[in-house]
Amino acid sequence: MKQKYLFIASMALAGCGSMSESNKYWIQYKDIDQSVKEVSFWSREQFHSPSDVKGTVYQRDNLTHLATSTPLGEIYHIYDVNHIPMNVIFLDTKTQRSLNPQNAQDMAQLSKATQFDFYEFGKGRIAHAVFSAKTGLCQDFKSKRGVALKMATNYYTDASYKGYYVSVIHAIIRHNGQHTDFAYTPAFSIADTKALAMTQALEKQDGERVAQMNLKEKVTLLTNIVCQ
């Protein structure tokens, strides 16, 4: 299957680098329900094609021990418009099975599901989105009903991934790019006062615009990958 491409919305924060070397570390993020969680990345030593599993993400509640962590899902790659690979998880909410975005059968299965979780790691951010439909994802996406989207995107302010700004959005999205019931809420977890002030100023200037771009990004995720 050909590579799948996705437009990326990003904030111009300081630490927008790769998370490829974070295997041994736990990174904190705030989820859609505002609970604080931590994730760690364990890469596969060998994979033979671009469509192979690249690794596994483990998750735990904030400040608990490794023994209580559980596998969140398997990492696959999709590609942005610059052909840069993105670390993602497509998780069927009902079965809790990780699905391969490069596998036509997996995407056909997902297209008929009523809900799935999407995670993205890298480019200085961690995002978790939940897509929900009443009858089927792609059927509703291409109809007036649309698909309910709720998402939290954590943008990290430096390479240590200690401070972050969170963009929480809710909306109904549709195949034609139109959306309704849009709501955007910012949150901050930044100890350094100067970094907090800078990030709050940036959010005030660009936060809602980037949130709208995130909606367009998730529309392309369904259009180009799940419902093509």
From Swiss-Prot:
Covalently lipidated residues (N-palmitoyl cysteine) read C16
**GO annotations of cellular component type:** plasma membrane
Q: Which keywords belong to this entry? A: Cell membrane, Lipoprotein, Membrane, Palmitate, Signal
Residues annotated for lipidation of the kind S-diacylglycerol cysteine are C16
Keyword hit for Signal: yes
- Name the major location: membrane
Q: Quote the subcellular location field of this record.
A: Cell membrane
Keyword Protein biosynthesis carried by entry: no
Q: What's the superkingdom here?
A: Bacteria
Name it.
Answer: Uncharacterized lipoprotein PM1509
